[in-house]
Amino acid sequence: MLKMNLQFFASKKGVGSTKNGRDSISKRLGTKRADGQLVTGGSILVRQRGTRIYPGVNVGKGGDDTLFAKVDGVVKFERVGRDRKQVSVYPKAQ
């Protein structure tokens, strides 16, 4: 007796799901005003996570560590010690 061994293969492969294709929106962090630039009170100077740059003279720190100007004036980025940076706002001389 003759035995036949028939095997049928899938004409379409199973479709797997991709592991790519998603990304979070950017948070737009970073320095918003440059050294020597004129700013008004309330202007955002730096958006950051944690205190990478510390508040100096006439600069406040928000709940999300955003640095903002308290008075109208000129922005000045400064080094404090070896490894600390701060931003200050000095009133413009009339």
Swiss-Prot record:
GO terms for biological process: translation. Residues 1-9 form a propeptide. The keyword Ribonucleoprotein applies. PROSITE patterns: RIBOSOMAL_L27. InterPro entries: Ribosomal_bL27, Ribosomal_bL27_CS. SUPFAM superfamilies: Ribosomal L27 protein-like. Pfam families: Ribosomal_L27. One of its GO terms (molecular function) is structural constituent of ribosome. GO terms for cellular component: cytosolic large ribosomal subunit. Keywords: Ribonucleoprotein, Ribosomal protein. The N-terminus is cleaved by ribosomal processing cysteine protease Prp. NCBIfam families: L27. Belongs to the bacterial ribosomal protein bL27 family. This is Large ribosomal subunit protein bL27. It comes from Halalkalibacterium halodurans (strain ATCC BAA-125 / DSM 18197 / FERM 7344 / JCM 9153 / C-125) (Bacillus halodurans).
